[in-house]
Amino acid sequence: MPWLLSAPKLVPAVANVRGLSGCMLCSQRRYSLQPVPERRIPNRYLGQPSPFTHPHLLRPGEVTPGLSQVEYALRRHKLMSLIQKEAQGQSGTDQTVVVLSNPTYYMSNDIPYTFHQDNNFLYLCGFQEPDSILVLQSLPGKQLPSHKAILFVPRRDPSRELWDGPRSGTDGAIALTGVDEAYTLEEFQHLLPKMKAETNMVWYDWMRPSHAQLHSDYMQPLTEAKAKSKNKVRGVQQLIQRLRLIKSPAEIERMQIAGKLTSQAFIETMFTSKAPVEEAFLYAKFEFECRARGADILAYPPVVAGGNRSNTLHYVKNNQLIKDGEMVLLDGGCESSCYVSDITRTWPVNGRFTAPQAELYEAVLEIQRDCLALCFPGTSLENIYSMMLTLIGQKLKDLGIMKNIKENNAFKAARKYCPHHVGHYLGMDVHDTPDMPRSLPLQPGMVITIEPGIYIPEDDKDAPEKFRGLGVRIEDDVVVTQDSPLILSADCPKEMNDIEQICSQAS
């Protein structure tokens, strides 16, 4: 390949310009699937934890906690296998994948938000610095999925590192992630002429770029130029999402950790919910308990909704007082080592369900148990959703909430009291792989949520007065297996007796 550098060489930026424009292929290097064992992590701080600086978090060979260089290389290999199938019959002999990192976002002048990497970029390489580009390039004379992986990263800059902390640089990026080559970000421009060639098919998400500035500087001109050729730029996000949909054993282990620590945070939050209690206090308690147990951040702003506010599905103000006799609905999760949890529990803040609360809660719990039993290969989230609506319709009749409803209107009535779906895919994102339809047959390794609810606003004149103002949702995280479903949130209490026992010990 004209611009290929032999992998072991990491030379100054000026020399690298020549390397990208023309150099011999290093035939001794086995690209892509196996990282180079002799590359040692620099004995300095990088732009993210490494086995050298954070041995309490990462073992040797890991890029992120629990995920090795080999795991990341295998993901890239699988992506190029998908591209090989997609590219059959298309013109163009070369294939190039471009994935941008996220930028740093700012809440106000000089005040950044906590950086969060683009999850497609992170999934393929594990590199956690902003302003970076991952390129996967097919190799001349070799069939896909053979390829090389290249990272373009911010150059080391002592003046910026004084303020913002260390950067990995090219040597750190290549040693930590196990990619084949690494260069400074500015050198990416030397790849553009080759990618513009008629023989090169480029895979890049130009419709939804994750980094507006890098898109404007580099990829927008390329996309516009190739729009006039036979080989237009093709999106890659759906292919990556197809891979992300099925979790590896290492990913499931990460999600088990997130589920366990979130479950413990729920228990500790229940312990402290003595009425009256502020929603803001429960919010703070939940976040503290997640972080104290090793979570990096909360996965999303939690819903901490007392009383009638539980009927606002995405209530996140969390600034009211929960009164004695009211329930609280807490929908919360954390992110731990790049993977998230998403759990919902509803409980009485005074430690005792009233009779109407218990009736409604037990109805939702029975529906949830029945839905969990359907989480096996071959069914789908859409199938489970239909069953949930049927079950809700029957429970609404049993509770006297839905009267004189004909069978053909039962679904519509059920949707009134549960206007959301039964669940969604879960992984690196809360609403993971959003382009993947819920009608897909479930497969072992998929992770989903099951979260039925019944919500009865206080002004609903159709419902019996005793139920008005009550909202209940129960949500668990589930791994689909060949056998029975694996409940990642099994440690989080949901039986009424267990909840009352915990809440009775509130301090």
Curated annotation (Swiss-Prot):
GO terms for cellular component: cytoplasm; cytosol; mitochondrion. Changing D342A: Impairs catalytic activity. Residues 54-79 are annotated as: Interaction with TNFRSF1B. It comes from the Eukaryota. GO terms for biological process: glomerular filtration; protein processing; proteolysis. One of its GO terms (molecular function) is manganese ion binding. It holds the Pfam family AMP_N. Catalyzes the removal of a penultimate prolyl residue from the N-termini of peptides, such as Leu-Pro-Ala. Also shows low activity towards peptides with Ala or Ser at the P1 position. This is Xaa-Pro aminopeptidase 3. The gene is XPNPEP3.
